[in-house]
Amino acid sequence: MGLVDAGVKKPGTSSAAAPIRVLVVDDSHVIRGLLTRTLDSDPGIKVVASASNGKAAIDEVAKNEIDVVVLDIEMPVMDGMTALPQLIAARPGLQVIMASTLTLKGASISMKAISRGAVDYVPKPTSTGEINSAEGFKRDLISKVKSWGAAGRRRKPGSAPAAPMQPGSALKRLYSTGPIKLRDMPTLFRPDCLAIGSSTGGPQALFKVFQMMGKVTNMPVFVTQHMPATFTTILAEHLAQASGMPAAEAKDGEPVTAGRIYVAPGDFHMTVAVEGGRKVMHLDKNPPENFCRPAVDPMLRSLAKAYNGKVMVMMLTGMGQDGAKGSKEIVDAGGVVAAQDEATSVVWGMPGAVTSAGL
C-alpha cells in the first residue's frame, strides 16, 4: 500500500472495455436469481454463472473466466469459509466478496474471511422482499463488484480492463485537470493523535496499516470506516489482533486514552471534545454527511479543535469525498494529511479528493 504525501501526482486515464464477469453463489435459488438480476441490470457487469454451494462454485471457477465471486457463507455440501481458500487458489487474482446477514455471527465470519483472503463483504437482506425494496443494498452490491473487479484487473497482467464505473469516471473528470502539486511532509511534525478514514476496500487496508505500524503507545487512534452496526464491533476486534493494541467501538462520554484504537460505531458519528481539561468521546445521530453515518468529516472537524491541529490523518481507499472538508480543517489548523495512492486503492475517491486539493 502506498501513501501519497509529497511530489506530483499525474492521474491516469481509463478506457471502456469488457464487463466485470461474476459468479453468484447462494444456496437459495430465489436469492441467486435476485442477485443475478440486480447485477445484470448494470451494463458494466455480466453474471456468467451461479452455484448453490461452495463445491459447485469451485467447479464453475475452473470452467469460466471470472473476475468476482459473490459468496454466501452458510450453504450445504460446502460452506463459504471452506470454499474461500480453494477458490482463491484455483484462480489467482480472483476477488471474493462475502454476502452476509446483518448479525453478529455473520459480521464475525465476514471479517474473518477478509483476514483470510476475501476482499470485502455485502450485508445481505434476510428476505426476498427486503432485497426487492433495498435500493441501498443494490447500490452497495453493484459498486463493490465493479470496484473490486476493476481493481483485480488492474493488478492482473494481460487481462482486459474493466468498463469504468460511473462514480469513478466522475472522479477521473474531476481530478484529470493536470498534475497535482502536493504539500511536503513537515520534518518536525509531532502529532498528538492519529485519525484514519476509509470506505470501500477499507477493512483490508486497515489491517495492513495496523500490521505495518504495530503498537502505537504514545497517542490515541481514531478510525471511521463506512460500515453498518454490528460489523464495526467485529472490525474493532480484528484491528486489535492486527495491531496488538486495545481496540473497541467508542462509547459516548468515555475519556480518551493514549495507546487505544477508537472505532466509530455503525450508524453513529464519532467526535472528540475537550471537557474539564480532558478529551472525551462523543457519539451522535446527527444527519448523515456525504450520505454516510458514521462519516469522516465530523470526526476530523472535532479533532482539529480538540487537538489544536496536532493531528495526523490517513485517508485510505473509499468512494466519494467524505473526509475532504475535514482534512482541510486539519491542515488549516496545522495538521498533516497522508492519502493512499491511486495504484493501491480499490476506489481512489476519498484519498483522491484530498490529494487533488493539495492537502
Regions found by a protein language model. Name each.
Residues M1-L23, H29-G44, K55-V70, E74-L359:
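Conserved acid/base catalytic micro-environments in cytosolic active-site loops
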Residues K46-V48:
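Short beta-strand elements in bilobed, periplasmic/extracellular small-molecule ligand-binding domains
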